[in-house]
Amino acid sequence: SVQKLKGKVSKFYTPLGVGAHLRAWGVSSDNIHELNWWEEIKHEELTFVCAPARHFSGRAFGDRFATLWASWIIQSKQQNIFFSGDSGYGPHFKTIGEKYGPFDFAMMECGQYDARWANIHMMPEETAQAAVDVKANVMMPIHWGTFVLALHTWKDPIERVTRKAAELNMPVATPRIGEPIVLNHPEMPAKKWWEEIQ
């Protein structure tokens, strides 16, 4: 949790409005940097870019849309990385790809979806297309295999996204939950390990 990280992390980069939550949890204002979409900030050798997403915000009843939701771009001299965050599919992915792509690695939301939630969570096929839109060299599906918020099966997100990604010639990294990966390694984990789970 943030409360366990606050003594170990020197800077917190958040979308606009999220700093209030961090201050309430004891993070010093001096350590919080809130960004609007398309704003960039440097930290040592890294550049963080707050980019659009399509979701909502809120941590309790009555505060929905009180803060900005976002995706993130993390750039170094060696890597250009995209993190989709929670997002419905939309034209913002192509815009991000045009402005900041191609990306060496993209972590793309895939899971906890329903046709009724299309504005805030992508279907797996849209996840694969969004990776193409941002010009990812490799995508890693995230937001699946953990908490259950939707009615789909546990394997449905990963089976559908890998199938669509294959159709689109989009390489997919599929590390086991908790397995570390090396971003500049020529081969990413691609084993279909979930097929072994009953």
Each model region followed by its residue ranges:
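Cap/insert and terminal regions of metallo-dependent hydrolase folds
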Residues: 7, 11-23, 80, 88-177
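Core dinuclear metal-dependent hydrolase active-site scaffold
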Residues: 1, 35-101, 177-198
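Active-site HxH/HxHxD metal-binding segment of metal-dependent hydrolases
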Residues: 1-41, 51-57
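Short low-complexity, flexible loop/linker segments enriched in glycine and/or proline
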Residues: 28-30, 47, 154-156, 188-190
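Structured loop/turn residues at beta-strand edges in well-structured enzyme cores
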Residues: 7, 27-30, 46, 67, ...
